[in-house]
Amino acid sequence: VNLTWLYVAALYAAAVWLVRRARLELPKRVALLFYALVVAWLFRPLTGPYVNLATDILKLVAPWTAAGVTKFNVSNYETQDLLFQLMPWAEQVRASWRALTPPLWNELAGCGYPLAANMQSQAFSPLRLLALPLPFGYAVTAEAAMKMLLALTTMFLWCRRRYEVIPSIAGAIAFGFGTAIVVWLHFPLATVAAFLPSVFLQIDLLAERRTCGRFVYAAFLGPAVLAGGHPETAAHLVFFAVLYALWIAFAERRGVRLLGTLAAVSGVALLLSAPILAPFLETMRKTSRYQYLEVRAHEGATAYSDLPSLTPLVQPRFFGERPGPIHGPAVAETMCGFAGILGIGAWFGLAAHAIARRRFREREVFLLLAALFAFLIVDDVAIVSAPFRALFALALNFRLRVELAFFAAAMTAALLDVMKRERLPLYAAIAGALAAMIVIATRNVFPDAQAKHFALMTLIPSAVVLLAAVTRIRLAVAAALFAELWLAAHAWNPVRPLRELYPHTPLVDAMPRSGERIVGLGGALFPNTNAVFGLADVRVHDPMSNGRYIGLLTLLTGYDPHDYYAKWKDGESPLLDYLNVRWIVTEPGAVLARHRLLYDGPDGRLYENRSVLPRFFAARNVLLTPDYAKLPEIDLRTTAVVRILPVSEAAGRDLLSPRPATAPEARVTMTAKNAMRVDAPRHTLVVSSIAFWPGWRVTYNGRSLEPLQVNGAFLGFVVPPGSGVVRVRYLPLSFYGGAAVALLTIVVMIRAACSTRPGST
């Protein structure tokens, strides 16, 4: 029985109670309406054995391969990153928290990397933590429902401060069910985007009255936004929030005291965010993604800025819908800026209203200017986009469509509010919306008459919205808007049976859970999917992967890091021995002469590598060299390569002197996970196949040893002669120090709150 709907209802009821207790205007009937709309949108995943993920994408790769399935006929291939990245990371985070362990380290991909530092894992997201009691598949839907409810409720609260109830509901619907949320529903981007109205609401509240409670809530929004897992969207959010605060302070003449308060809030928010932000900043420069962008940043024109790519801002389904034929740029990156046709028309209506009344300091003028600014960047108008691109050089700024949709939703509420009193804004809005529809209908090129007919049919729901607006019955407009968004975006996240979400197969069940690593050749058991089954893979499909590790694979195996779906192709590579790979998964029929066949079935083959090395072992010889160019010529079974040896001169001579094959060797005996007994006849370098990152702590009989980077990308350490117990632990100071800073900040805030009179500023 799927009671996710009931669990979400209980959480939402508690949230509504807190909002009402804070004396914010949220009528119970409005909250009930929002919950009912979300249940309608997610009905089957909330109530039955379903999940709204394109799980049939898994049928493209072994061991789930199905005949006749291609990326062109699966339900929505655009969401493949969910199945191959985000869902496995989510399950790892959940498993770690359920074991009462902070999800700091991912040992199941690429010989290990920091999991929490990969912000897209959302290791500290409040929504992820709230969904922990639910099974994995149901938790996915619960998080989606909470994002929608958060976006709907806070958008309503923000709009309600200026507009009547029905316009505020319409604005909430335009944002909460718009493509900015729905297209990225299961992505971290939507988690951060859902907090957009909250940030703007808190700026309003602090501008109105500065109280202890409002200060504290605003400060905690910082870590909540960062924990959402998309730094790029968080940075864009902060940029527009700063503009909004400046507008209130200067254009609305509310004084600079607000800016001082917001600066203090930002400082406290940064301190509270330390355990989230510090690990990310510590590891970011060492990742393959960052190192790639250092060489080749997002230069040149803003992507997706041509007319076909801008067309989905007016109608997302204009070029077709999945899994049907697509004849234009109907991809997630172009489709995430739609908040209903009125959002476009409202810009023209509110502009006419401001000009007619000659009132240019009102809040609606900020919405006009912010939306125009975002559009000029998306449209790549150089005078605006070039400086912005220089400021956000590492960001994909075409994703400002999300902020554009947010402002469009707010303008929808403003238009519905003003049209009750004046006709000019309504007529200007209808004219502007019709003009946009005519432009995309007449200036786009269609491959055939059928495609053109489909495109024109997609404009009918928008026409119905405009007809409803003509009646000036605002409730009818809100209903038509919801229907328009349903037709435009509801099918984007297809509903599939829950049993299709990473199902067990005979091949998966045949793999021993012995602790040694696996590798899949080609697309077999695609990287990250292994994590769902608790299997450690040496492959990576992750922008946070270790840059040096990727470089090593490129040097020694011909791995192509520029291939988005980079594959391991050589099942006979001796590097597999060093990487502790015992199990090799292949597609059906693949032959590996060096390895022993353990399983052969229609879902693939499983081989055992009998020459695998342990995770930790003693290197017989040590080579000190300033670079790793000689690595392809070195037998990593017997020789370790280092750039530095931070030991005494005598120990260095001992380590670097050649050791014949007949010389006694050190013995490394594992006693527990990452714990071992080392018996060394002389100074010995113990090497591992665990990726080297900041944060490793090594002790020998309780005494600290310095972690070394060996063989280009791995962890090693030097032990003295004799016997001793070694413990290796990942204890990043960036996290634990950051957590201490955050806790100290909370203590100071509590003390300050206790000494503050109720209601004081």
Where do the model's predicted regions map?
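Active-site lumenal/periplasmic loops and adjacent helix-entry segments of GT-C-fold
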Residues: P45-R162, P167-F195, A301-T334, Y700
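Membrane-interface helix-loop junctions at the exits of transmembrane helices
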Residues: V39-V51, W97-T101, N118, L127-Y138, ...
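Hydrophobic alpha-helical membrane-insertion signals
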Residues: Y7-P114, M284-T287, E333, N493, ...
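Active-site-proximal, structured, solvent-exposed surfaces of multi-pass membrane proteins
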Residues: F375, R539, R582, P602, ...
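Hydrophobic alpha-helical transmembrane segments
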Residues: Y7-Y12, N118-F124, Y138-T153, M335-L350, ...
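Contiguous transmembrane helix-bundle modules in multi-pass membrane proteins
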Residues: V1-L32, P188, A194, Q202, ...
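Periplasmic/ER-lumenal interhelical loops and adjacent helix-loop junctions
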Residues: L58-T101, A269-A354, F375, R389, ...
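Extracytoplasmic
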Residues: Y292-G300, A451-F454, A479, A483-P664, ...
